[in-house]
Structure formats: C-alpha cells, structure tokens
Amino acid sequence: MMNILLPLLGGFIITAAFMPALIRYFRARHEGQMIREEGPTWHEKKSGTPTMGGLLFIVAIAVMTLLTSWVLAPHHMLPTTWILIFILVLYGALGMWDDSIKLFHRQNEGLKAWQKMLGQIVGALILFWVYTHEQLPMALHVPGIGNWHMSGWYAVFVILWLVGFSNAVNLSDGLDGLVSGLASIAFAAYGIVAWQQAQINIAIFCFAVVGSLLGFLIFNHKPAKIFMGDTGSLALGGALAAVSILLHHELSLLWIGLIFVIETASVILQVASFKLTGKRIFLMSPIHHHFEMKGWSEWRIDLTFWGIGLVTALSGVWVILAK
C-alpha cells in the first residue's frame, strides 16, 4: 500500500508546495499564455495567465517515481520505469520548446507540426526498442478476441498511438482544469490495473502522476492561476499511451480516455465537413468549445466531462480485471 500512498502524497505535496513560487516567477517576468484568436472571445481575459505549469508536475512525477522505487521497491526499478519517465520528459521537453517559442517570441503557433511530430516519433521508437528488449508480446490485445500478432507492424502502432494520444490530450487542454481532471482519472484507472496485475513499477508511476495532477489542479481549476501548457499536455498524453502499451491493454485507452478521443474526433469531423461541404458540424471545435458557445459554463463542462471520464474509467477497469 505504501507503494501507492508515497508517490500519490509525495507528488501532491511537491506540486502544491512549489507551484505558487513558479506562478510568482512567471508573473514577475510578465510571461503568460497568448490566447489563440480563433477561440471563444471571452477567453481573451485569460491572456497573460502563466503557463508551462506542466514543468513542475513533470519533475514531481519523476522524483516520486524514482524515490518510491528506490526506497520501497528497488527490485521494481525496471527498464519500463525508466522508459515511462523518458517519454514523460521527452514529450514534456517538446511541449516546453513549443511553449517557449510562444512566450519569448510572442508567436502563438509555436513549433512547426513536422518538428513536433519528429520528436514524438523518436520517443515512440525508443519506447518500441525497450518493449522488444523486454521481450514483451509483439501483439495487439483486442478485447473479446485475443492477441493480434503484428510482428514489425507493432512499431507502426506504437508510433501512431503515442503521436495520436499526445496530440489528443493537447487538443483537449482548452478549459481550466479539464485535462488535469481527466488525466488524473485515466492514470488512476491504469494504476489500479497495474497494481492488481503486480506491475508495481507502472502503478508507482501512475499514482505519482495522479498525486501531482491533483496538486496542480488546486491552481488550475477555474479561474486558473496557471496553465499546464503544451509542456504538460504533450507529456501526459505520451505517458498515458505508453502506460497502456506497457500494460498490454492498448485499446482500452479508447474507452478509458474516451473524452480525449471525442475531442479529437470533433476536430477531424469539423475540418472534414468544412472542406467537403463548406458547413460546420459544431459551433466551434474541439467539442468543449461547442458547449461553451451553447452557453455552458467552464465548470459545467468540466464536471460533465470528468463524470463521463470517471464512468468510462471505472467500467474499463472492471472489464480488464474481470478477465
């Protein structure tokens, strides 16, 4: 039980204790988020809010994962522990580079798409290398059917999974607290699965994420005092995809992370519809902005999406463990 409580509480305490200092630092330097012009007009009042808060919870996650593994479970300090931290840090570094361009060069576009994708692919290939080195199955687990052996094609899947979900979480990060809550729920679900399946190193990592995000949520709920930025959202998305792969429950993420899937699908459908017919399906995409345009408050959207995320996470865990 301490393997769960230590990273959970430690991550929470580190993030909650040091986040005020990070907020003061960014405010003193007058560095804050630029709000994209195509978003809701009332989001303009958020302009100048400190960003890159993900930097602190990435540090908290890494510290508590390594500390807990070293103190309580040194025999669980496996290559999979290191690759999860590596993916978290690499994708976070990509996001931080992107955020830095927006902050210091006052360009709201950030990195070019190909630059971001190249870094994401490199991280995915390194994850695949560790996966094969650990002699994990080169097969995709399909619920209700069994394992679909993919051989070398599994590398393609790993790339698509990490790139896809890191961008999906990034797209979802458009409301105060939304991704912090959704990611906490999803990582808690996989932490329970990992614990029950005796993959303690992955459970430690997952609960370090949960604790750190809950500490961050204190400052990120509406009205947000700081945003996680691409630094946080890309890191969380990449790590979440990596966890589902290492647990060999890859496709479960489509259900446990259903809101992320819906957010991404809404953007794809919106763009496709406008290109093909000249008409938009939603008032604005991603879909959380559609509900804003319908008059929903940010808190109402957050609570609704968190509720859906909790239901899909609990039911997903039940299905996995029922086997």
From Swiss-Prot:
Summary of the function given for this chain in its UniProt record: Catalyzes the initial step of the lipid cycle reactions in the biosynthesis of the cell wall peptidoglycan: transfers peptidoglycan precursor phospho-MurNAc-pentapeptide from UDP-MurNAc-pentapeptide onto the lipid carrier undecaprenyl phosphate, yielding undecaprenyl-pyrophosphoryl-MurNAc-pentapeptide, known as lipid I.
Key words, A-Z: Cell cycle, Cell division, Cell membrane, Cell shape, Cell wall biogenesis/degradation, Magnesium, Membrane, Metal-binding, Peptidoglycan synthesis, Transferase, Transmembrane, Transmembrane helix
Record localization: Cell membrane
Record-level GO BP terms: cell division; cell wall organization; peptidoglycan biosynthetic process; regulation of cell shape
Family matches, as PANTHER family: PHOSPHO-N-ACETYLMURAMOYL-PENTAPEPTIDE-TRANSFERASE, PHOSPHO-N-ACETYLMURAMOYL-PENTAPEPTIDE-TRANSFERASE HOMOLOG
Family classification: Belongs to the glycosyltransferase 4 family. MraY subfamily.
Protein name: Phospho-N-acetylmuramoyl-pentapeptide-transferase
Pathway the protein takes part in: Cell wall biogenesis; peptidoglycan biosynthesis
Class of the enzyme per the UniProt entry, highest EC level: transferase
Species annotation: Levilactobacillus brevis (strain ATCC 367 / BCRC 12310 / CIP 105137 / JCM 1170 / LMG 11437 / NCIMB 947 / NCTC 947)
Residues in coiled coil: none
GO molecular function: metal ion binding; phospho-N-acetylmuramoyl-pentapeptide-transferase activity
